[in-house]
From Swiss-Prot:
Binds to the 23S rRNA. This is Large ribosomal subunit protein eL19. The keyword RNA-binding applies. SUPFAM superfamilies: Ribosomal protein L19 (L19e) (SSF48140). The keyword Ribonucleoprotein applies. GO terms for biological process: translation. Belongs to the eukaryotic ribosomal protein eL19 family. Keywords: Ribonucleoprotein, Ribosomal protein, RNA-binding, rRNA-binding. GO terms for molecular function: large ribosomal subunit rRNA binding; RNA binding; structural constituent of ribosome. Gene3D superfamilies: 1.10.1200.240, 1.10.1650.10. Part of the 50S ribosomal subunit. It comes from the Archaea. It comes from Korarchaeum cryptofilum (strain OPF8). PANTHER family: 60S RIBOSOMAL PROTEIN L19 (PTHR10722).
Amino acid sequence: MDLEYQKKLAAKVAGVGLDRVRINPEKIDLVSEAVTRADIRRLIRSGAIEILQKRGISGARKKPRRKGPGSRKGGKYSKLPRKRRWIRKIRALRRELRRMKEQGLIDSKEYRELYAKLSSFNSVSQLRAHVGR
């Protein structure tokens, strides 16, 4: 028995997708007679047509579990884009440069010169080596 029409109508009446509409197999004959929206509403109330619960996000995804390096698929830059990587590096370098200036390891003139060429350093340790601790 084709109940496609009833299923579509039930989905529209309930405001849900087709996948969330379940027709009770024991009451198929009752559902097949339904033609109007009112009939469908009555069948939903009686339980012949059931609206399934919305699927949620699994607990493991909610709390960011299973996101370690072994679970990651995709390229190096799809996980941490170049821009994010750059931001992380440059912020660390600027933080270190500011700290050096505050501790008196470099003066204001050196600070400005180094700030301008920070992009040429790959890491904080490289910056420290250049300043010559």
